[in-house]
Amino acid sequence: MNLALALMINTLLALLLMTITFWLPQLNTYMEKTNPYECGFDPLSPARIPFSMKFFLVAITFLLFDLEIALLLPLPWALQTTNPSLTIASSLTLITILILSLAYEWSQKGLDWVE
């Protein structure tokens, strides 16, 4: 009962805050707020420089592999259970998936900086 009440109150509070921010936007914009700022001078180059798509793909690949490696961190505690064979099998499956995905990424030249 307490959990349901807390979830209901949190949901209502979030909806109330979203409604308030939607109906009461900041309407007064000044030219100083919309101008770019670079040490008090006008910027010498555009602020929105394009970044390399190759860098973006390598960064996303790193995040995916990092997340998958983080799944292996509780492995020493999981091996202390009464049935460690299931834990070993699941961890070996995860490591196999990691190796296969790394081999696929390497074969598709997803880790190369230059073309």
Curated annotation (Swiss-Prot):
Entry-linked InterPro entries: NADH_UbQ/plastoQ_OxRdtase_su3, NDAH_ubi_oxred_su3_sf
Subcellular location: Mitochondrion inner membrane
Enzyme class: translocase
Assigned GO CC terms: mitochondrial inner membrane; NADH dehydrogenase complex
Presence of keyword Acetylation: no
E.C. designation(s): 7.1.1.2
Domain of life: Eukaryota
GO molecular function, one term: NADH dehydrogenase (ubiquinone) activity
GO biological process, any: mitochondrial electron transport, NADH to ubiquinone
Chain segments annotated as transmembrane: 3-23, 55-75, 86-106
Catalytic activity: a ubiquinone + NADH + 5 H(+)(in) = a ubiquinol + NAD(+) + 4 H(+)(out)
Keywords: Electron transport, Membrane, Mitochondrion, Mitochondrion inner membrane, NAD, Respiratory chain, Translocase, Transmembrane, Transmembrane helix, Transport, Ubiquinone
Similarity-based family: Belongs to the complex I subunit 3 family.
Functional summary from the UniProt entry: Core subunit of the mitochondrial membrane respiratory chain NADH dehydrogenase (Complex I) which catalyzes electron transfer from NADH through the respiratory chain, using ubiquinone as an electron acceptor. Essential for the catalytic activity of complex I.
SUBUNIT field: Core subunit of respiratory chain NADH dehydrogenase (Complex I) which is composed of 45 different subunits. Interacts with TMEM186. Interacts with TMEM242.
Name of the protein this chain belongs to: NADH-ubiquinone oxidoreductase chain 3
Native source organism of the sequence: Hylobates lar (Lar gibbon)
